[in-house]
Amino acid sequence: MSRQPIRIGARGSKLSLAQSGLMQARIAAALGAGPGDDIDAFAQLIPIVTSGDRIQDRRLMEIGGKGLFTKEIEEALLDGRIDCAIHSLKDMPAELPPGLVLAAVPEREDPRDAFISHVAERLEDLSKGARLGTASLRRQAQALHVRPDLEIVMLRGNVDTRLAKLERGEADAILLAQSGLNRLGLGHITNSWLDPLAAPPAPGQGALVIETRAEDVDLPWLQAVRCQATTLAVAAERGALYALEGSCRTAVGAHARLDGLILTMIVEALTPDGVQRFRREGSATLSSLDAADQARALGLELGGAVRAEGGPALILTE
């Protein structure tokens, strides 16, 4: 094949390579790869180590926020070393660097948070004062809202690292994204799931996204991997994230569901200690002409209402 392969940038973690490998196969097929073809001749995966992967002993908010998972990859995209990037959408900041766009979102995996423990089947069943491991401010606040007695243990690292810490007894239970467990072939270890209506996951959780330079957004192969229903749901969720100025210093959850042309959504934000919770629910009937704009507008409206009610109390200041 004379054409140069598409160069796909992705984090070098085990989970990132697993999910990026799935997208590599999809992209190669969209470019014409057949069952027996070498997909690397059509789409080449280029692992990039990010600052977020290198620094594992502190919360993201202490070292620069979600952008640390994307900065080096986006620099490679902007200077032409790669042609596109694969990310977990929940890791993407509310605003992107100039010149880059979220070009395609494939079908979403399970968006729920998974509860994993050797001593309890559900979060509600943990003993008084039990230790819950998470580095997510949202998961911390949602857990403390229903179980204020829990001790939150800061637990960063990849999935294997967190599971190993659980095995060593550093926590009595942990919360992880079910989508990541599924993509690693570990979906069976989950004890139970958090209800996404009672505890909405991070905006975009469970979805992957292909980021490109703005001038490449209409390339034909991108259209082949897009899922319209997921695209609209995450447009609403990211609209809420933007309205709430979501970051690693805010506990923001959003979950949108598309049924036909009706998009239903719930948005919530909590104070970091979980004591106060502010939430809004709403729906919109989408038209075929400007559905993405309408979906985002719903998220902006609900997120704006939550922000107006919660105010400065929603931001972790220390």
Swiss-Prot record:
Cofactor(s) the protein requires to work: dipyrromethane
The signal peptide, as residue positions, is none
Give me the reactions it catalyses.
4 porphobilinogen + H2O = hydroxymethylbilane + 4 NH4(+)
Q: How is the cofactor bound?
A: Binds 1 dipyrromethane group covalently.
Question: Could you provide one GO biological process annotation from this protein's UniProt record?
Answer: protoporphyrinogen IX biosynthetic process
**Top EC category:** transferase
Q: Pathway, according to UniProt? A: Porphyrin-containing compound metabolism; protoporphyrin-IX biosynthesis; coproporphyrinogen-III from 5-aminolevulinate: step 2/4
Instruction: Kindly list the GO CC terms recorded for this protein.
Output: cytoplasm
Pfam families in alphabetical order:
Porphobil_deam (PF01379), Porphobil_deamC (PF03900)
The record, for Gene3D superfamilies, names: Periplasmic binding protein-like II (3.40.190.10), Porphobilinogen deaminase, C-terminal domain (3.30.160.40)
The EC number(s) given in the record are: 2.5.1.61
Keywords annotated in UniProt: Porphyrin biosynthesis, Transferase
Under Gene Ontology molecular function, one entry of this record is:
hydroxymethylbilane synthase activity
Give all S-(dipyrrolylmethanemethyl)cysteine modified positions.
248
> Subunit structure of this entry?
Monomer.
Member of which family? Belongs to the HMBS family.
Q: What does it do?
A: Tetrapolymerization of the monopyrrole PBG into the hydroxymethylbilane pre-uroporphyrinogen in several discrete steps.
HAMAP family from the xrefs?
A: Porphobil_deam
What protein does this entry describe? Porphobilinogen deaminase
- Record the organism: Caulobacter sp. (strain K31)
Gene name, Swiss-Prot/TrEMBL: hemC
